[in-house]
Amino acid sequence: MHPSTMRCMHLRPVTMHPTSRMLCWKRRLRPKGVRSPEAIRGRIQGTWRQKTVDLPAGTEICCFPSLPKAPICSTSTLMRLRSKTNAKRADFTETFESSTHGEAPAEWTTIDADGDGQGWLCLSSGQLDWLTAHGGTNVVSSFSWNGMALNPDNYLISKDVTGATKVKYYYAVNDGFPGDHYAVMISKTGTNAGDFTVVFEETPNGINKGGARFGLSTEADGAKPQSVWIERTVDLPAGTKYVAFRHYNCSDLNYILLDDIQFTMGGSPTPTDYTYTVYRDGTKIKEGLTETTFEEDGVATGNHEYCVEVKYTAGVSPKKCVNVTVNSTQFNPVKNLKAQPDGGDVVLKWEAPSAKKTEGSREVKRIGDGLFVTIEPANDVRANEAKVVLAADNVWGDNTGYQFLLDADHNTFGSVIPATGPLFTGTASSDLYSANFEYLIPANADPVVTTQNIIVTGQGEVVIPGGVYDYCITNPEPASGKMWIAGDGGNQPARYDDFTFEAGKKYTFTMRRAGMGDGTDMEVEDDSPASYTYTVYRDGTKIKEGLTETTYRDAGLSAQSHEYCVEVKYTAGVSPKVCVDYIPDGVEDVTVQKPHTLTVVGKTITVSWQGEAMIYDMNGRRLAAGRNTVVYTAQGGYYAVMVVVDGKSYVEETRYQVNLSWTRRLCADTSKHRSVIVSEYESVARPPFKEVGRLRFYAYYSNILLKQFVPKSCMKRLSYYLPHCKKGSFLRFPRSSTVITVCQFSWLEYLPVTQGVAGSSPVHTAKIRSCVEIVFRHSSIFVCYRSTGKYNYRMRLFNMLGKNFLRTKQKCLSLLRSAWDIGIKLVLFQEGRYMESPGQSDEERRTTIDFYGNGRYLLFRHSELLVENGYQVKAVVTMLGTKPMGRGHKVSPSMVKLYAQELGLPILQPDNLNEESFLDELRTYQPHLQIVVAFRMLPRSVWQMPPMGTINLHGSLLPMYRGAAPIQPRDTPWRYGKRELPPSASGMR
């Protein structure tokens, strides 16, 4: 305890004797009585006098003996000093007004570590006409140029400031020569240079570069190079004893000035004077707390009221309460659970739970003066991860906020991230962030100065792998059109080259105003990872727990159907289960090498193998059969070849035609609607889409799937479970993440184009009088469009993963094993990739798409399904706006533009599609495919650009009911009593 100073007003019946003295004890005395006031009646009061006595540390009781030879203290002369000695020390401000111009400041210690004889000096505005003090006339200064270049390393050290919690000061530099670097340092021991550590440092930036420099002997001649005074406040860690200002790491600039340094002193009653008691829902759950934090695990989900009261010796304070909602979803589940056969085993694979906490799961509330309550769920950050938090509270007062950009490759500083100045001015490339920064706060941050994807008030966070990063904190300002990078007015720079984020740590960057600019204060906390394990269930029974790996093998069960579930067990609770149905199909993947050879030479189809083979046409008629070798001369069209070896089925589809036309035999009323070019099938053991660069459409009768392999009784039983789909049946075949839906319709009602695009399936959407097969990419959703009224279409979603349905119908499902093999051939892009040489990476094989659209036709979710199913939509092209509408005759953006803005997709709005500027920008995206819905006519230069062609989707078969978007909820072909206009698709090469 620091020695305290006591000021006493001494009142006694007689004047205090000059030799009287104060006696103090460090032990507590208990008075046993009080003298009667009558004892002093009739006495004459002496003169009031003031005395100041320094007390040693630990003093509790003082005595005032009044007689020179009577050291025994009466009880009336005892004073208890507990409250005084623990009281807060008075704040104080150093103005340097008592110091002399040209000399070291009084009551401060200076160290000239560089030894050039020029350290911190007091300057007076009365002596230098270029100087303006912040308050009064005096300041303290250190120079990096004073008639010649200097390399300063100067310390300005305060007196003992034990108990200080903050230091506020003002500084100024030469506005034309900024960059005089300085640091605020603290020492908990002594005043040697090696005793100090940095708590804050910065390099000031000026506005006007160049001009005159000034020293102790320089005449101003009317010039005022000094910058405005900038205020800084720095928090001091507990135990701080001395504070130093160090001027260093700069040369040949000019000076730095300090003035009005104010220390805020701490101090509070000792912890033993009061404690905290915590209540939940009116029940006392913890008392006797001396810390200002409390954690409780295993709290039941729902709403709870937490209250805190302070218990003093003489009583208790009123309770301060806060409502807290505990949400079970804060325990994140696993992601992307899959069940696949491997030999005779079932292998489960999944991804670790998301490291990002549930939105709003952390709550900080002020519930009284100086009292905060923080509610945060169990930690879910892995051992190799760090958490970065960006917090702000409307720093500028104008609702402009901040973004945090992190580059995991740490190679953008000095190029993308400038060393000084804004990130960019005006308009930046739409992929500036996606191409250079792997992690963003907020996650949808975009490089637009008018963006609303910012942190204004509140906080955002991201979990990153521990390691080295380049980062910057941006502040978009619409008024100036600049993407500013925040200033360095805090304890951590807002831009950094090669900063190390340690795993297991939580880094909180809090934005604040700093003088005329802003800055960030960084706080680092230990955020050690929570321990969690995985539990696996089969058909509702726990079969394995305590797993730490993201895979599990269930031996010997690949021939049976089961439901598998995985849950995450945290210290504080468990996550919801994630489940998947496993159904054996016994069919090899089409990409696996098959034990047979299939060749097509001219019109001759030859199959060689060791087993039985059959060749079918698309009407289900068997054309040829045999063992070991089958040869068939084709008459034209498509053919299915089925090979059975060791009880396993392999199916290939083949054809010999180069050009495929859509005829009346396949699709009604489509003779005027020409198809696209189809390349010749040349593969032996690959699907029939070997070559890249040609868009293929497949449309054919699939009676073979029903007549040859599925009994009518089975189809009827399946139809019973799907009453919503008119005269149809839906089956699921889980292979990877592709779903095949087999529908039987007497008349196909409004088969949606959406499935053909988003599912990457053959786009056969014309009216078909028999049966059609549609291949989806999504693994758990079935989509069926049907007419539920005279004018209304509705989309119904069927999740057919229910275990009861699959178990009771697995015999019917097994009958369609070969149907699966035929169907898999129709997937244009399997799993979002197209087939090419095996040497390329997955990223290189990703199919990229440009989307064109404008009208309400997109209510059928063409664009949404493209994005949600993982396709890389590189850009969206839409019109500038609709015609003026409403009272204000305002031009509204198209629905496509609004949706693209929501997703953060690049938007192109050309006036003229033939403009070179538009074509050049379009080429930069290098799309593999273009999809056009409800848009204007495209010139050849546009639709020929993608290597895989352009798909143009219509709401009806042209030319009848033509128009950009003829299909609207209020305006359908059914309105006119006609049924001949299902949607259509065309391909352009």
From Swiss-Prot:
What is the documented function of this protein?
Cleaves human complement component C3. May enable P.gingivalis to evade complement-mediated killing during the immune response. Plays an important role in soft tissue infections and is a virulence factor.
GO annotation, biological process: proteolysis
Cellular component (GO) terms are:
cytoplasmic vesicle; cytosol
Keywords of the record: Cytoplasmic vesicle, Hydrolase, Protease, Repeat, Thiol protease, Virulence
Q: Where is this region: Disordered?
A: 969-989
- Lineage summary: Bacteria, Pseudomonadati, Bacteroidota, Bacteroidia, Bacteroidales
Q: What is its EC number?
A: 3.4.22.-
Query: Where found?
Result: Cytoplasmic vesicle
What family is reported? Belongs to the peptidase C25 family.
Q: Under the GO molecular function aspect, what terms does this record hold?
A: cysteine-type peptidase activity; methionyl-tRNA formyltransferase activity
- Protein name, entry field: Protease PrtH
sequence repeats mapped onto the chain? 270-323, 528-581
